[in-house]
C-alpha cells in the first residue's frame, strides 16, 4: 500500500489533537470542586481517593479508617497513593488525580504514533487518533478519575509491543520478549480481569513464533526456550507480586471487590447467556453508538465490521508485511474479546453494575477495527481516483471531521449534572457540619459521602470493606443489624437499601429532585433492633 501523506505531517496533526484534548479536559478543573463532584467523578473514584488518603495518614490500606481493605486495582491505587503522599489536602488530591487521568488520555496518542510508525502507516494513525478522540474526549468514562485512562494507555502500549513482536517474528528477527512481557504484566496490574487478555496475547505471540519454525521445532526450542522460560518466570513473578500485595493489604490473595463481583457467578440459562453476551458486546462498542441505534442494528454493525476486516485481509493481496502482522494481532484481539465476553456471559457474573466502566480493551479493539476499515476503504478509493490532493487531504479531512464531532458532543455534555451526586454531595457537606467527628456512618454507596464529610463511613456493599465483612455478613449468617451494632455505627446514609435492615427512624432526607422521586435518607441505627444479646 502506498503512502499519501508524510508521517511527520500526520504526527503533527495527532500531536495537535492530543494537546487540544488535554487543554479542553483540564479546563474542566476550573469549574471547581462542586462541578467535579456532581458532573465528573463517580462514587467508586472516591474509594481510591479516600483509601489512599487514609493509607497516608494511618499507615495501612483502609477506606473507613477501621478495617483493612484490598478492594482496589493495584497499579492505579499505587499511583493515587503516591499522589496522596505529595498532596497537602484532599481537594488537591482530587484535582491532581483528574489531571493525571487527562494526561494519560493524551499520552495514548504517543503509542498510537508508535504503532503507526512501526506499521509505516500515517493514514492509519490519523484514523486511530481521531477515533480515540471521539471515545476519550466527550464521554465521562475517561474523565472520572478511575483507572480507565491508565488502562487505555497500558493497552495501547500492549498493542505497540505486540505489533513490534509480530513484525520481528515475520521478518525472522529476534523478538523482544521482555518488552512484551512487562507491558502484559502492567496490563494485569491495571485491571486484574485483563490477565485473561494478557495470557491470550502472550500465547498467540509465542504461537506465531513457533509457527515460523513449524518445519524445525527443535530449532525453535533451541533458539527461544530460554527467552520463553524467562518471560514466563517474569510473568509468574508479576502475578505473585500482585497477589502478595493484595494479601498484605487486606488478608486475601484476590481483592475483596473481585470476590464479591464473582461470588454469585453461576451457570445461567442459554437464553440468559445469549442476552448477556449481546449486552456485553454492545457495552464494549464505541460510546458514540450507545442509545442511538436499536440493539439489532448495533449487533449487525459489529458483526459487519468484523467481517469487513476479515474480507479485506483475505481478498487484498498487496498488503504490506507490517499490515499483515497487524491483521494477525487484530485476529488475536478478536479471539481475546470473544473469550472474555463468552466467559462473562456463561459465568453469570453481573456485568452491568460492576464492569460497565472498565472497557478500554474493547473500545480500543473497535477503534482499530474501524480504522482498518477506513484505511482499506481509502486505499480502494485511491485506485479509482488519481487526484493528488484527494490522496493527501482526504484522510486529514476525515480525521478533523471526527475530531470536530468529538468536540461538539463534548460541548453538549459539558453541563451534565447527576442529581444523585448533587444530593449526595449536599448530604456529605451537611454531615460534616452537623455531626461530631467521632460519629460512625455506613452506606452501600459510601465513596462520595466519606470523602466530603470527613467522617468514618463503613462500606456496606463490601467492595472497599474487608474480607471478614464479606465472609461473615455478605456470604455468612451474621445479620447486617448485628454488624452495625458491633462496629458502633450511628447512622446509615443512602438512597436505597440493598440488604434487610430493621425499621430504623429517618432523621434527615435529601431529595434527588428527579423523576424517580427518590431521596437520600439518614437512618439512625438503634442497638435495640439488633439480634445481638
Language-model segment annotations:
Residues 96-120, 157, 161:
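Transmembrane-helix motifs of polytopic, lipid-linked glycan transferases
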Residues 150, 190-192, 196-199, 295-299, ...:
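Hydrophobic/aromatic-rich transmembrane helices and adjacent perimembrane loops
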Residues 31-37, 401-450, 456-497, 512-533:
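Membrane-embedded, lumen/periplasm-facing catalytic core of multi-pass transferases
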Residues 111, 131, 150-170, 178-184, ...:
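Specific aromatic-rich, kink-prone transmembrane helix
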Residues 15, 19, 109-113, 206-216, ...:
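Hydrophobic, aromatic-rich transmembrane alpha-helices
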Residues 10-18, 122-128, 175-182, 202, ...:
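Signature aromatic-anchored transmembrane alpha helix within multi-pass, membrane-resident enzymes
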Residues 69, 143-150, 463:
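Short acidic/glycine- and proline-prone juxtamembrane loop motifs at membrane-interface regions
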Residues 38, 49-51, 55-72, 247-317, ...:
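Membrane-lumen/periplasm interface segments of multi-pass, membrane-embedded glycan/lipid transferases
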Amino acid at each position: 500500500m502506498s503512502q499519501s501523506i508524510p508521517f511527520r505531517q500526520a504526527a503533527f496533526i495527532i500531536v495537535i489533537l492530543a494537546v487540544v484534548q488535554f487543554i479542553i479536559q483540564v479546563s474542566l478543573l476550573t469549574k471547581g470542586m462542586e462541578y467535579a463532584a456532581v458532573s465528573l467523578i463517580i462514587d467508586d473514584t472516591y474509594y481510591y481517593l479516600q483509601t489512599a488518603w487514609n493509607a497516608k495518614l494511618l499507615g495501612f490500606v483502609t477506606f473507613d479508617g477501621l478495617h483493612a481493605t484490598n478492594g482496589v486495582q493495584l497499579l492505579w491505587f499505587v499511583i493515587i497513593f503516591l499522589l496522596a503522599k505529595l498532596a497537602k489536602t484532599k481537594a488537591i488530591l482530587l484535582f491532581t488525580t483528574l489531571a493525571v487521568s487527562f494526561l494519560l488520555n493524551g499520552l495514548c496518542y504517543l503509542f498510537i504514533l508508535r504503532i503507526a510508525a512501526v506499521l509505516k502507516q500515517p493514514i492509519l494513525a490519523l484514523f486511530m487518533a481521531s477515533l480515540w478522540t471521539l471515545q476519550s474526549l466527550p464521554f465521562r468514562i475517561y474523565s472520572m478519575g478511575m483507572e480507565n485512562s491508565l488502562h487505555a494507555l497500558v493497552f495501547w502500549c500492549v498493542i505497540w509491543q505486540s505489533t513490534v513482536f509480530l513484525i520481528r517474528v515475520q521478518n525472522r528477527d529476534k523478538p523482544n520478549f521482555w518488552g512484551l512481557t512487562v507491558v502484559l504484566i502492567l496490563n494485569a496490574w491495571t485491571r486484574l480481569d485483563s490477565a485473561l487478555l494478557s495470557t491470550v496475547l502472550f500465547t498467540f505471540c509465542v504461537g506465531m513464533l513457533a509457527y515460523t519454525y513449524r518445519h524445525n521445532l527443535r530449532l525453535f526450542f533451541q533458539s527461544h526456550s530460554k527467552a520463553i522460560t524467562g518471560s514466563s518466570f517474569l510473568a509468574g513473578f508479576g502475578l505473585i507480586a500482585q497477589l502478595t500485595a493484595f494479601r498484605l493489604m487486606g488478608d486475601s490473595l484476590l481483592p475483596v471487590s473481585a470476590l464479591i463481583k464473582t461470588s454469585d457467578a453461576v451457570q445461567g440459562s442459554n437464553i440468559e447467556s445469549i442476552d448477556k453476551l449481546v449486552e456485553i458486546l454492545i457495552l464494549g462498542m464505541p460510546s458514540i453508538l450507545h442509545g442511538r441505534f436499536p440493539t439489532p442494528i448495533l449487533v449487525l454493525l459489529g458483526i459487519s465490521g468484523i467481517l469487513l476486516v476479515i474480507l479485506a485481509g483475505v481478498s487484498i493481496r498487496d498488503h504490506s508485511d507490517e499490515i499483515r502482522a497487524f491483521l494477525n494481532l487484530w485476529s488475536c484481539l478478536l479471539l481475546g474479546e470473544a473469550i472474555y465476553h463468552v466467559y462473562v456471559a456463561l459465568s453469570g457474573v453481573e456485568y452491568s453494575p460492576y464492569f460497565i466502566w472498565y472497557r478500554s480493551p474493547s473500545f480500543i479493539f473497535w477503534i482499530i477495527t474501524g480504522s482498518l476499515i477506513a484505511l482499506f476503504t481509502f486505499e480502494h478509493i485511491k485506485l479509482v481516483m488519481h487526484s493528488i490532493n484527494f490522496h493527501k487531504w482526504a484522510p486529514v479531512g476525515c480525521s478533523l471531521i471526527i475530531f470536530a464531532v468529538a468536540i461538539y458532543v463534548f460541548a453538549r455534555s459539558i453541563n451534565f449534572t447527576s442529581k444523585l451526586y448533587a444530593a449526595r454531595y449536599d448530604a456529605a457537606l451537611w454531615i460534616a457540619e452537623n455531626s461530631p467527628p467521632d460519629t460512625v456512618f455506613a452506606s452501600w454507596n459510601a465513596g462520595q459521602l466519606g470523602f466530603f464529610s470527613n467522617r468514618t463511613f463503613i462500606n456496606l456493599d463490601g467492595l472497599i470493606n474487608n474480607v471478614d465483612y464479606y465472609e461473615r455478613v455478605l456470604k455468612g449468617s451474621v445479620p447486617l443489624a448485628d454488624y452495625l451494632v458491633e462496629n458502633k455505627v450511628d447512622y446509615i446514609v443512602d438512597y436505597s437499601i440493598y440488604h434487610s435492615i430493621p425499621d430504623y427512624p429517618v432523621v434527615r432526607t435529601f431529595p434527588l429532585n428527579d423523576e424517580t422521586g427518590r431521596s437520600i435518607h439518614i437512618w439512625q441505627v438503634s442497638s435495640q433492633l439488633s439480634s445481638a444479646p
